[in-house]
Amino acid sequence: MDFIGRTSELATLNTELERGSGFVVIYGRRRVGKTTLIKEFIKDKQAFYFLATTESEAQSMKRFAGVLSRTTKNPMLCKVTFTDWLDLFQVVADDHPDEKKVLVIDEFPYLVKTNPDFPSILQNAWDEVLKDHNVMLILCGSLISMMKKHALAYDSPLYGRRTAQMCMLRRTCRLSRLWSSMPLQAAYRNIWSFSRRMNRW
């Protein structure tokens, strides 16, 4: 079954992946489907998915190393104590360097709250490590003002790096139009499937 209601967004992400080194910013209110969209996009790709929280920076680095360990199937990475984000991003760049891969940082603003210098750190990582190694970077967040300030604004260190951005809105109206154009039985099936997904969100 098609991924209901976000086919255009999926198409945009796939186009960015073809660039080899896309930098995508996705933002919008909570529970509009940002993470669901991203996970649908990366499910059949070489991807590193990291969900930031309000924990300390050291703990974030430790969990990020765990993501790298599981994705690269290198258990030794879990035993390393990383103190520099650049070293972690280098692991992403070095993994299958000739293949396209995706790095997702979900709830990006939490990392900025923990370390206000993180946008500068990420800018350096993108320019010096990630950009030329077939990495597509996705920054996602629900704190809209912080996403605009730290990922999109002119005075952000990340300004000028993005290749695409998405402001995701609720899709009720779009889905209503979609379902109204379907045969009745197909519409019922899709509404039932959509309801189950909403419950999981």
Role assignments for model-derived ranges:
Residues M1-W201:
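Phosphate-binding site recognition
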